[in-house]
Amino acid sequence: MVGYQMLPPVLFNETIIPMTDSPYILYGGPVSLYTGKVRSYLRKNNINFVEVHPNSERYLKHIVPTVGRWIMPCLETPDGRIIQDGADIIDYFDNEVKLSRFPIRPTTPVHRAVSHLFELFGGEGLLRPAMHYRWNFDEQNIAFLESEFSISVIPKMTEGKEQINFARSSGRMRKAAITFGVGPHSVEAIESSFAEWLELFSAHLANNAYLLGNRPTLGDYCLMGPMWAHLFRDPAPTALIKKTAPRVGRWVERMTTYEPYDGEHFESSTAPRELLANDTLPDTLVAMMRFVAEEYLSEITAHVEYANNWLAEQTDLVTGTNGLPDPGARGIGKTSFAWRGIEIETAVMPYRFWLLQRLQDAFAECDATSQTAIRTAFRNAGLESILDLRTIRRVERANHLEVWGPLL
């Protein structure tokens, strides 16, 4: 693949000598949901990079101490700068070094707001199907997952030890699935919901190569996290996608390539890479936004309410910290809410509020006329309240960690 080179092992040693023609180093893994959007962006924009697993010596001895926790993705630039988090990594390429082939943030207000909506939903709103279809289909998935997880182990283990290691790591991930609301009581609703998502996305892709037209934007890249790492690579869900929503599968494949991959949109390989005209939203995209409202609005609303109550109780919380004993901890508790006719409980993570703020900040930057247009579009999709849903402290990122800002 153009721009995706394998490099000599010397680059993975503890000391890396910066070179002007050196690649960027992406610390992540094929099974990682959050690495998926960054890898897609790098490939789609033909950026020279190599992917290194986060169990490498360089990652463990240098990256983890720098960012304060074992987490992926992380990026190391040729001059040695470390950037953690997919949103920050994409911002670096798009805003700072300006390596995007095409703008990933629309300039028109409604399209920009919608791209940030799917940034939030892509990263956080499809976790239930991603975890369910990975960890509740052992007959179809287990051999693949054992093989995938085994390549993350350094040094190489014997087969018996690999199985023990996989049992341990997969056990942790199965517990994580529960914290995202996956359980016997929710399985039927998760599968019904995901089938609806595939149907709606497929209908939209019948006339659009990407979410907002003829080129990918931020929302496309962020949807690639769950749609690639879990839902298209793992055997059980990819079989479902290929059987019931092959257009969605082709979108996933388009999002992994630099070269044009537009067989079903013949004009798009030669036509200008433009977005939908006049800041419009086709009915098929509005239907997808309504799905986001039904699927995720009750959850993020409950999380903000929980966080505000929690923050009110933390009378000694120091601004610039996460208010927890472990500075690298991501969750502040759990809360329950009504979802598709049942009640589920999920972990409350401030990182989600940081993504939500990106949508709200984009809205706040608009003039009154543009804000009215955004509100109208979101109201038509049942999502207007998300524009005003705020915690009493902003979430900030400092030294690669989520921290609370001052009281508002």
Please report, for each region that a protein language model flagged, where it lies by residue.
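Small-residue-rich helix-loop
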Residues: S268-M289
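All-alpha helical catalytic cores of prenyl diphosphate-utilizing isoprenoid enzymes
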Residues: I164-M173, F180, P184-E199
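GST-like domain detector, emphasizing the conserved glutathione-binding G-site
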Residues: L11-G160, L211, L231-F232, L285-L408
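A non-catalytic, amphipathic alpha-helix used as a structural packing/dimerization or gating element
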Residues: V110, V114-L117, A189-E196, L200, ...
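Inter-helical turn/loop segments and adjacent helix faces that build the functional surface
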Residues: V97-P103, F180-H185, N207-L212, R233-L240
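Short acidic alpha-helical/loop segments enriched in Asp/Glu that coordinate divalent cations
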Residues: L212-R215, R233-T244, P260-E274
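GST superfamily/GST-like fold recognition
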Residues: A209-L231
